Amino acid sequence: MTRSIQQDRSIEKSEAKTANFNQESIFKIDELFFSRTDNRGVIEAFNSVFSRISEHADDALRGAPHKVIRHSDMPKAVFWLIWDTLKAGKPITGYVKNRAKSGRYYWVYAVIAPVDGGFLSVRMKPTSPMLATVAELYKKILRLEREDGLSPEKSAAVLLQEIRSMGFDDYMDFQAHALVTEFQARENALGRTPFNALTNAIRVAEAERMICDKIASITDELAQGAIYILNMKLQAVKLGRDRAAIDAISNNYDLILGDIKSGITRLKSIMSDASTSNFSSRKESQILLCASSIMAEVVQNFDQGDEPMTTEERERESVYLRNLHAAFSNKSTASVSAMMDECRQVLGRMDSLRQTLLGLSAVRVSLRVETNRLGERARGLDSLISEIDQSHQRVRNDLEQMFETASHFSSAITAS
């Protein structure tokens, strides 16, 4: 009889969990929760919000593997990517669907980072339209895992491929966009003033993209310069004894064009160095700024909250939280400093290019004067001068737009 009652209770619990499977646990947008694990993923500490949402008793959570809250809707690819990044000593962020003890689900946007002796994860409630997109993506990846028997690593490769097909360069690009989107959605929902440092970092990224596009445009335009020089020399040959002045002008044009090309190459190098360095990456800057702000709020909530911990445990966890906040804050500060240094270099290089372009203008004037002097004998140069004028104007316009953008770039950084 006792065995039958236990079986009945087990069946009742199973049915209750099944009934709750499509119900969402209450996770308020103004809440944040954290958990800290050892290097194996065993839970060592957490706050009261985590235990309430997960519906597990505090004693049951301590010492339990973090996968105790894993939802069956989550593809293994996501966890492979998370662990692969964490083992490399790098933080990672992303969407995760968790399962409460009752069977209810709750979505989180997690910021996870290595800490001394393990890992610390902070979660906020995702509310942007990105969540629906990611939920569908996870369903697709999960289906492939089950139908094709993909290993977690191969599934992660498919996940990254899908992310690239969505228009992102890589996971860094994706997570920066996702975190910023969720962070700003949360800030707006809570009625907070815009986070100026983040807004400016986004503008800087947009400015850099525009500058890189203009550099490519100028590079293409300068490639035509060799054709103009060749045509000048060909026209000079036709002039016979009167060719000396045109030859000299074409040589000067060639020299100045070479200086401009060198300046553009150095500018490209500055932009390339900025995009490949660790903490001058604009996308990473945005992640760091969001993470720093989130951690500051977690620390404040922890200090003011009534957590299920002894005084000794509170002091220990406070150190973990403050250290991670300091790490994110220091790295975001370093990133802003790198942006300021890059900005100074970019503006300096552009100013030099503007001066060099004035020299090219002088050569164009000389060519026009000499063409007018030669009259009918230099008739073939008229159309060439027109082409050079148009090309010069395009380069000038691109350069001025770059300079204006870089100036706004500088103002945004200074305001940060």
Show the residue positions of the predicted features.
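Membrane topogenic helices and adjacent juxtamembrane segments
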Residues: 1-20, 165, 176-183
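Sensory/regulatory domains in signal-transduction proteins
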Residues: 7, 12-143, 200, 205-207, ...
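Sensory coupling linkers of modular signal transduction proteins
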Residues: 117-191, 195
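Short, charge-rich amphipathic alpha-helices with coiled-coil/heptad character
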Residues: 186-204, 326-335
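Acidic, serine/threonine- and proline-rich intrinsically disordered appendage/tail regions
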Residues: 311-315
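Intrinsically disordered, low-complexity acidic Ser/Thr-rich regulatory segments
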Residues: 316-340
